[in-house]
């Protein structure tokens, strides 16, 4: 046996050493067989004949480039550019190999003869004739077909075509247009009609398709994948005039935006394309098709100077997990956000292999430099070559650093390299003809740097030009042949700046890679250019501040800023100096006395002295007494005025004996500005204004304000009011209403122009992004930077080429694009207010209308909904002599339709049935006997009076409903006084019988109206409510909605329209109309101020139907409550047509008041089931929710999201490693079942859902707000409310006087880590302030409601800056916050930051339960993402007033205007604007500032007892009986907040109950929140459990005092009526929290 084993081992050794012949033969046989199989496979490749004559080198090049084909080089044709011509056949066949056989295919600009010869009967070629060469090419195609046909005819009869060609030629014979057409691909009308996805190929034709048309054109043809081949040279991206394609002997030549492609051996083949279009195609990744589909470019391969790529259609709605088919897509078009280019160096190297391991250097031609005429270009040079030269010559001393030595060294290393004493060929392939220019350029770079260091080290004080001269002399000594022209040559390099009093050397970056250059060239946002003018901007800001200060302090002075600056420039005088001189004249500090002005007040004297024209003045017009009360006096003279004011009023308006209303909006009234320059029309011609006019326009002597004169008019010449200007209106009440309406139009136009100026002067770098209702159009690029919701606007504000803003009227071409003036326009801005000319045109007409009382007898017909007001108008009106006016076009059209149908003739026309705007703007000569106004209470009272005066009528009938929606003032910084909102009528008629409303709705009407309401409708029950689980269910395919669709908000309306519903309107738009069936839809779950029992919007919504109304809602609210109430009413009661709902009374029981703060220990009793029972009472159903695997379900199911433009990395969709790691953790199972969820795993879906919830789909509720002026007013009110004036002034003086000391204060208290971050920071450049990282909190927030049962809670997001940014700004804002908190009136206001719960309890202990107060709580939903540029302007104004440095303020604002969110973990990138960032250093204190400013602007905090603020929480104690404004409307229209004001019996603040007793208060944490946390599913061990118990015990320590549990019961009942008593629950909670062993029993370890 041993012998056998030995023999076996010997044989193995022999085989291993090759001595065994049998094994060697077997191995040779194996190699032979593999070679045979390989050749057999190669023989199966498609066979191609390369007929052109090419060289042996080219033969190898073609064979290696296309291994997919078996190529036979027949060499039967000799032609020019034979290599390129032969390659076109291979390129087309390579792309057709990618197309599935038989799949319909479009060949864009293709050779249809080649497809015919290949037998492809499924290809359509688009062969447009773009020039004469294309015509000639089509002639050759026809000849080729003729030759082929003749070849098969022959002399002896017809030979049949090959079988595979028969179908293709039969198709060409029967339908040539199916094979080829002469249209460009974008306009091709041919359709395969198969219903299948098509393909497309483009062989060197993609250049001629505009970049923006590629995606839509492919999608219109239902193309799934498009394969394209094209030539390109990276030299074109460097700005080179020539780009060579050496392999095929071709080149690109650049001529402006045209690039010419031609062959060096033959000049007739010459094609011209758009260079800009080629760059866009090369640089971009996404080609949008519509609002859903996008084509993604994927690079395939580069072969013989030809790039191949494919465009793959992607469905952005479906992600990559599922497949769906939609028959049609939305019509609105949007472009995806373009990502930064070439971030991946590997991808970059594949695209442009010649740029691999190379850097860009500036190249100077030595011959031009010697002549003084410098031309700078760029060149790609091997990086090692450049670094070797620079590293070597940098060691030369000054004597050795001459150009000859550098040239000699460069030549030596280029020509040879010595290795071990042997000279070999150089490894660097640098063109020899350019060595001179390369060496000179590198020499110049190093020489400039060394001489710069020398000049600084010498410390010689020389003029700036002397320094440059000195450097030129140094360079002359280093380069022979340089003469005096070297100085001019250095200046032309652009490296030196001698404009100021110093020499600045700006050297280019010598080590810039090709990808870095592309990023800077094509994606940079020009921050360097903006920073270069910072000093100019700062001086300009100072000038405008000084001008503004003079205007505010001294009325009557107007500045033409442009003329003022030109004047200062001409005299070479600092504008600030003249500003101080003017101020000194005003204040009489300059010692200058003007003759003849001694009797005038200082203000007026100074103004008259500075005026260049004559003025009319009245003596003794100085007013010194303050006017502090509102005075209403009818039919009295000006006796209440001072004599000066009375004379002035008489001069201005005559001795008017009518009624007069005087009101003020400010602290005191100063001298009104009564003087004006000649040739200036002042609008409004309304009240006596105490400051400068609101709206004025320079005019000629005989000109007036016309619409035609406004086109291209300077906005700066329309002097807009800055703040709410105090105005005194004179005349009768109707005259005052008319004057107020002109002011309203002026303020509306002023706010619109102000906001449009902000937009048009801002820097926007994106393309077709969305921001509220604004639109911004770049006239140079002919594209929208900000895409408006609707296009076709009537007018806009344009930034002209002279850097002025002007009003323009827009026109459009046939395609709907605006017709622009590229020469004079840079960009223009539009918004929702620029859709029509109504405001401008109304100002034009009404300015010329005399303001007198119309003297019309007005009868108000006040009727309930459906009482037949419109029918009564149609029945009573005399269509020959009377006029009907309506607020909207829909109502006017309805009246015309019904009247013509009733009389069976066109009695109602556009002349006697008109809207208010149309009637005022387009006056006609008709006079009317009577005017009938439908829904007349919806318009401004001044507009109604103007319309009645223009009509010339003697009597008017105003039909309306005082309980329905009134006129809404949408200009938030304009005051529409209460007394002017009242319509003055002579008679009132009432209608209380409704013919529309069913009986159940009539029962509701009786709770609204004081008189009994009856109905004639036979319908008994008509309303019902349906709760939907979420807004995503509201789609036509999922929820069928019958009847007219009505919404409460514009956002819900737009959401339903996007979902696919038609005929949707808001309640405001359909007031006064009637429908058989209606569907009222609420898709917004957050509180809406319009939805309340006494809201007029709810009344309108419930009374539009005659038969049925269904309310679809995502939450239960006041409407569902009303519907539930009317459904309970018995039918027998409804037959009475009138009913009243009894008032529900709550039995009150006096609390037991303890006269001292006692301590009563809790009795620690009970079992954990007590806590479970209490939780289920408060939040029924939450404990039955099985949500452990909701995250898994979401990943496995199809998801459809409504996204704003963003970039998604789909490879991060399934976070497999994190899932595996999470499953390996042993989570304890809680005994208590609450709404707490398991920790989520970050990934694309989770983070995307969180980002949609927290950052996207922002509310758009705000009206027209003058942001700049409104923010100034709010900030002033903020400081006057919370800070005493003397404290604020002391602080500002301290900040400005000792900024270094301020820096030392916060630096001394910083931790070592923060100081270390500052020490390691690279101060050469600024960090990216506008770039934020995004992450999520893994643990979902447990909410104290039942939403967990119907929705998948989104995680909380953290949007944060890098540490280096926080290290700079964190200490600064911390210092400013500390200073602010030290100034707050701590006796009345409490900012819950850096405080303890004990501090909160001590703050409220001043109030007892006996105090006469009411508790208000402002609840705001979507708080962070509702904040816009308005909120940011307020916050920045607060910081600046606290002393924030101007530079830091500018940087901070730049980092918050247009910000980039990047989530590297999930692979998401998107843009947001101004929105609150949840993780930057001002998140908490900034939110606190905003909520405090919001409350202070809406409530009289000067009368409050206490107020506390924390983040988005607020609690205010005010005296009872105060009247408040419409908080919901103000929060919506001004602050863009979905907010609601609650009156509470007990305060609830930051998760704590504020319980007041007889002698103070006690603060209890919310026990329900603590019990909810006991269901925590993220605990991983009992050590973790113990840490959790200690943290809860620290929070709940005040619950161990049971003395006031009876009051806590009442407080909990206020929020949770079904809670029952809470004492036993708190006893049980304290028992478990205080016992480690018992608390441990609340969690089970299933692994044991």
UniProtKB/Swiss-Prot annotation:
Q: Which residues form the (+)RNA virus helicase ATP-binding domain?
A: 831-991
Question: What protein name applies here?
Answer: Replicase large subunit
The UniProt record lists the EC number as 2.7.7.48, 3.6.4.13
Q: Which residues form the RdRp catalytic domain?
A: 1413-1526
Q: Which residues form a coiled coil?
A: none
What one GO molecular function would you report for this record?
mRNA methyltransferase activity
Question: Can you give the residue ranges of the Alphavirus-like MT domain?
Answer: 72-287
**Additional remark text:** Readthrough of the terminator codon UAG occurs between codons for Lys-1144 and Gln-1146.
Q: Name the chemical reaction catalysed here.
A: RNA(n) + a ribonucleoside 5'-triphosphate = RNA(n+1) + diphosphate; ATP + H2O = ADP + phosphate + H(+)
